[in-house]
């Protein structure tokens, strides 16, 4: 008594076609298909993104290393200036 049979589904389908018309249902179906296709494409693009981020991370690490190497000579120069002030 709680389940819907094939006869009830057929009656519901006929009522929907009569209410909306075949053109409206065709447009609705194509819009739904395009939405699903766009969603799948977006999910596929998302899975391809992480490998490019890994490359950027390795470049960032090299960049940080070069910055620390450049800052070390500046720190040594400041130490020598402060050492000269203490002696002088």
Swiss-Prot record:
Listed transmembrane segments: 1-21
Keyword entries, A-Z: Cell inner membrane, Cell membrane, Membrane, Protein transport, Translocation, Transmembrane, Transmembrane helix, Transport
Region described as Disordered: 41-88
Protein's UniProt keywords contain Iron: no
GO biological process: protein transport by the Tat complex
UniProt GO MF annotations: protein transmembrane transporter activity
Annotated membrane topology: Single-pass membrane protein
Comp. bias (Polar residues): 46-56
Composition-biased stretches (Basic and acidic residues): 76-88
InterPro entries: TatA/B/E, TatA/E
Record carries keyword Calcium: no
Pfam families: TatA_B_E (PF02416)
Assembly information from the UniProt record: The Tat system comprises two distinct complexes: a TatABC complex, containing multiple copies of TatA, TatB and TatC subunits, and a separate TatA complex, containing only TatA subunits. Substrates initially bind to the TatABC complex, which probably triggers association of the separate TatA complex to form the active translocon.
General function of this protein: Part of the twin-arginine translocation (Tat) system that transports large folded proteins containing a characteristic twin-arginine motif in their signal peptide across membranes. TatA could form the protein-conducting channel of the Tat system.
Protein name: Sec-independent protein translocase protein TatA
Lineage: Bacteria, Pseudomonadati, Pseudomonadota, Gammaproteobacteria, Enterobacterales
Gene symbol of the encoding locus: tatA
